[in-house]
Amino acid sequence: MPLTLSFLPSFERSLKNLDTEQKEIIRILLKALTAYYDSHSNLHEAQKNAPGFFYKQLRKPFYEAGVERKLRLVIRREGETCAAMMAGNHDQVRRFLANQ
């Protein structure tokens, strides 16, 4: 069964701090992430939508996804349920995780 993605209020709040270009990058990232989850975590399928797509575990239960190194998406993964928690740059992600 493929993983499912939901969005937490903290993710919606983090989008308000992004400019139009960054929001477009997040849109591309979410499309690639959806392809990754729908293909049972096949990285090649996700990279068809976004060649620079990456997905890695930070520490349980937190994962990070991105299509470029500047913007990342923090995901909390529990079983087959994944929740997008926030979008931001490296420093914003570190600060966010320090408070979790």
Where are the predicted features?
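Basic, Lys/Arg-enriched alpha-helical interface segments
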Residues: 1-71, 77-82, 87-100
